[in-house]
């Protein structure tokens, strides 16, 4: 009977540990990327991004763990749309009902812009739904999650930088 010794190249204990470490880090990174993507889950604004974000003529931007105008944001997501304003407005009414704080700008008896402060996602992690309506069914919806106060939101929206 002949005994063969199997030789596995690069299969030392050190490389096995390194391979395991790489796999664990990859899984953790994937989980970290999924969490911000689910940030607005439970809010109606999530439906707006899902339904209209990839529609022709729409522009959607999503940034995670970024700085915008000097403010540190965990999630920034915006949608510029060219139609479906009435449908989007109806969807956002659901978030309005659940909002902790509501700020709206009214022109000629019509709400044209504003923001809703939602319940925090975690301690010191506030969530905001901002919107602006234009003419012809156009408008913008923004979701922000971060350590921002309502005053910070007002500064972001109305400062001239």
What would you call each of these model-derived segments?
Residues 4-12, 18, 72, 77, ...:
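Compositionally biased, intrinsically disordered low-complexity regions enriched in proline and serine
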Residues 38-54, 148-161:
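Flexible, processing/modification-adjacent segments and terminal tails
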Residues 1-45:
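Bacterial Sec-dependent N-terminal signal peptides
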Residues 101-161:
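Surface-exposed, polar helix/loop patches in the mature regions of secreted/periplasmic/lumenal proteins
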Residues 75-121:
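Mature extracytoplasmic domains of secretory-pathway proteins
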């Amino acid at each position: 009977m002949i005994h063969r010794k199997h030789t596995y190249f690069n299969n030392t204990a050190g490389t096995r540990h390194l391979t395991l470490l790489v796999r664990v880090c990859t899984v953790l990174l994937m989980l970290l990327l999924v969490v911000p993507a689910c940030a607005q889950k439970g809010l109606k604004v999530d439906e707006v991004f899902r339904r209209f974000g990839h529609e022709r003529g729409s522009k959607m931007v999503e940034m995670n763990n970024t700085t915008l105008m000097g403010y540190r944001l965990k999630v920034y997501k915006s949608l510029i749309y060219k139609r479906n304003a009435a449908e989007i407005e109806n969807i956002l009414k659901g978030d309005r009902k659940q909002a902790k704080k509501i700020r709206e700008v009214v022109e000629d008896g019509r709400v044209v812009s504003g923001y809703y402060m939602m319940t925090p996602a975690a301690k010191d992690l506030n969530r905001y739904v901002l919107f602006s309506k234009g003419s012809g069914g156009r408008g913008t919806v923004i979701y922000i999650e971060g350590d921002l106060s309502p005053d910070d939101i007002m500064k972001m929206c109305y400062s001239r930088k």
